[in-house]
């Protein structure tokens, strides 16, 4: 089961669109679920995601125009409970102790957060944490040189194989990280 994880698009305020090389990779009919950390910013970005998969879950980012998105969400995909937040609630941004507290409060196997615009994926105390980064490479308050990235999770039974796609220069680099539920 393929799950696309992305966020912080900031279209059209900071970027015009997803990189063309990412659009070529993201084709309709291949992905079953989309988990978005927010800051889509427009209905058009949401409509684009709906063309890729029927099951789209979005949480509200600090720049989203739509107030209909929830602040947080817990989604079950296969054997995994996945928590989804934008990440501006985590202080300081990306703080491990704050993320671990949210993971315990949500009682999830995987916690997905964004906001920092920097990709991260790691295991901590037998739980898995993912920050997909910014799919467009939009700048943030602290940095302008952001590497565009998104994540595809391949969920099979009690294993998640995470593929991170990063646009470095003109090349899409892919890294593989595996997490087994204990």
From Swiss-Prot:
Membership in a protein family: Belongs to the VPS29 family.
Species lineage: Eukaryota, Metazoa, Chordata, Craniata, Vertebrata
PANTHER family recorded: VACUOLAR SORTING PROTEIN VPS29 (PTHR11124)
Gene: Vps29
UniProt-annotated location(s): Cytoplasm; Membrane; Endosome membrane; Early endosome
Function: Component of the commander complex that is essential for endosomal recycling of transmembrane cargos; the commander complex is composed of the CCC subcomplex and the retriever subcomplex. Component of the retriever complex, which is a heterotrimeric complex related to retromer cargo-selective complex (CSC) and essential for retromer-independent retrieval and recycling of numerous cargos such as integrin alpha-5/beta-1 (ITGA5:ITGB1). Component of the retromer cargo-selective complex (CSC).
Pfam family for this entry, one: Metallophos_2
Domain of life the protein comes from: Eukaryota
Protein name: Vacuolar protein sorting-associated protein 29
